[in-house]
Amino acid sequence: MQSRAVILKYRSGSGHKRSLPRFYIDCDLDTFDFEKDCSLIENEFPIYINNYKVVYKSKPTLSHFLIEKEFPAVLGPGMISAVRTRLYEPTMRELYQESIHQLKRSNKKYLLSALRWPTGIPTLEFIDYYFEELLFLSEFDPGSIQRYLKLLVKASGLYNSTNEEQIVEIHRRVLIEGKKHGLTAFDLPGNDILGDICVVQAARVTRLVAKTFSKMTRDTHLMIYFSISPVELVLSKLDKKGDKRAKAKGLMSMSAARSYDYFMRTDLGFRETALSTFWAKDWPTPQETILSDKRCLKEDMRVTKWLPSPPHYPPL
């Protein structure tokens, strides 16, 4: 199946400012050349695969395919075996009950801020599609497919790219954003691209709810999300950060002599260096710094070497 995003002319008469261009999806659902490399998306419709080798085997996550320059013949649970995390399912279900217009009218900043990813504007379109279409889709529906393809364009930001490139870019963004919230490739396996986006949105909501709760304890809406979301994971991290900040403030208030005594008592490396009679340099040489940076870069490449080049604009 071939599809393209057709950008519509800006509507000058409307006083509404748009962050994203108006567009619709023009796709040909009738003609498809199955002799070319293709992958079946959501067990519903095929797309052409040009940049990866299509393989008929099972692996834990989509990342395991991409790192070997491969793409599964079926992008779904049949060939991607890892199960997406269910930790944020209650939060996702609560978000499904929301209206983005009502959230804007009520000025729920913690929710609106969390829902800005991945498009840059607050949206519940991915949550709505997940619960309305993916869970209850029982037959080949051209309208649902066009809606799915439109969400791929919005999530990836790639208006003039193939569906294959859009899916890979979305998976890249999902893993990068998910990592900030403690989610791994096994939590976001890629067998349901839009479902993974919903999980990351729910994780962002959980984080902002946990950070906002202490300031707005009388907000009933906030209390509901606080009670159903796994906020304990976020709070434990915030406590650790708070301990570090308190420790740093305490050290800043110490005199040089007191801070020396403190590190002599608590830091073995500092104590060994202070008591050592061996003469050595006080800082790394430029050559040592370059080698250290190269080692860090190699470690990074081992984790993200499959990631495609980002688009020609800053990620949202």
Swiss-Prot record:
Q: What GO molecular function terms would the record report?
A: protein serine/threonine kinase inhibitor activity
| InterPro entries (alphabetical) | NSs-like
Keyword annotations from UniProtKB, A to Z: Host-virus interaction, Inhibition of host innate immune response by virus, Inhibition of host interferon signaling pathway by virus, Inhibition of host PKR by virus, Inhibition of host RIG-I by virus, Inhibition of host RLR pathway by virus, Interferon antiviral system evasion, Viral immunoevasion
Q: Write down the superkingdom of origin.
A: Viruses
Span-the-membrane segments of this chain are: none
Name the Gene Ontology biological process terms: symbiont-mediated suppression of host cytoplasmic pattern recognition receptor signaling pathway via inhibition of RIG-I activity; symbiont-mediated suppression of host PKR/eIFalpha signaling; symbiont-mediated suppression of host type I interferon-mediated signaling pathway
Subunit relationships: Interacts with host RIGI; this interaction targets RIGI to proteasomal degradation. Interacts with host EIF2AK2/PKR; this interaction leads to the proteasomal degradation of host EIF2AK2/PKR.
According to its UniProt record, which protein family does this protein belong to? Answer: Belongs to the phlebovirus NS-S protein family.
Q: What does this protein do?
A: Promotes the proteasomal degradation of host EIF2AK2/PKR but is unable to suppress host general transcription. Prevents the establishment of the host antiviral state by interfering with beta interferon (IFN-beta) production. Interacts with host RIGI and targets it for proteasomal degradation, thereby inhibiting RIGI-mediated signaling pathway.
Q: What is this protein called?
A: Non-structural protein NS-S
This chain is encoded by the gene named NSS
